Swiss-Prot record:
Keywords: Cytoplasm, Ribosome biogenesis. SUPFAM superfamilies: Ribosome-binding factor A, RbfA (SSF89919). Monomer. Binds 30S ribosomal subunits, but not 50S ribosomal subunits or 70S ribosomes. It holds the Pfam family RBFA. It comes from Malacoplasma penetrans (strain HF-2) (Mycoplasma penetrans). One of several proteins that assist in the late maturation steps of the functional core of the 30S ribosomal subunit. Associates with free 30S ribosomal subunits (but not with 30S subunits that are part of 70S ribosomes or polysomes). Required for efficient processing of 16S rRNA. May interact with the 5'-terminal helix region of 16S rRNA. Belongs to the RbfA family. Its main location: cytoplasm. GO terms for molecular function: ribosomal small subunit binding. One of its GO terms (biological process) is maturation of SSU-rRNA. This is Ribosome-binding factor A. The keyword Metal-binding does not apply. GO terms for cellular component: cytosol.
Length: 116
């Protein structure tokens, strides 16, 4: 059975993911940032840091998006502060979600094996 605090952190991670996804699609006017898709969020045990894993369809611009969206992390933190029932809103760090690239790599390897 999961420890109660783990369940609470997972619930906060889900809420943070929803809030940031909604903000990107509805509140952000920057076309570059709008291309980002939030895949998942990890929240530190003390709830002080939220790592937000994003990706985009065009892999060539992910570095530009990360630079720009990390520059706007204060905007997203303000949204969290207004919507989360926490004493202090977590600092937000946006990171590239490389899991999709790894899945594609595994699938291509499986196709190569299947072709032999």
């Amino acid at each position: 059975m999961k420890h109660m605090s783990n369940v609470k952190i997972e619930r906060y991670e889900s809420i943070i993911k929803d809030l940031i996804s909604h903000a990107i699609t509805t509140l952000v006017y920057d076309d570059l940032i709008k291309q980002a898709t939030v895949h998942y969020v990890t929240l530190s045990k003390d709830k002080s840091i939220a790592k937000v894993y994003i990706s985009c369809y065009d892999k060539t611009i992910i570095d530009k998006i990360l630079k720009k969206i990390n520059g706007a992390s204060g905007f997203f933190r303000t949204i969290l502060a207004k919507n989360l029932n926490l004493r202090k809103a977590p600092a937000i760090v946006f990171l590239n979600d490389e899991s999709i690239d790894k899945i594609d790599e595994i699938n291509s390897l499986l196709e190569q094996i299947k072709g032999k």
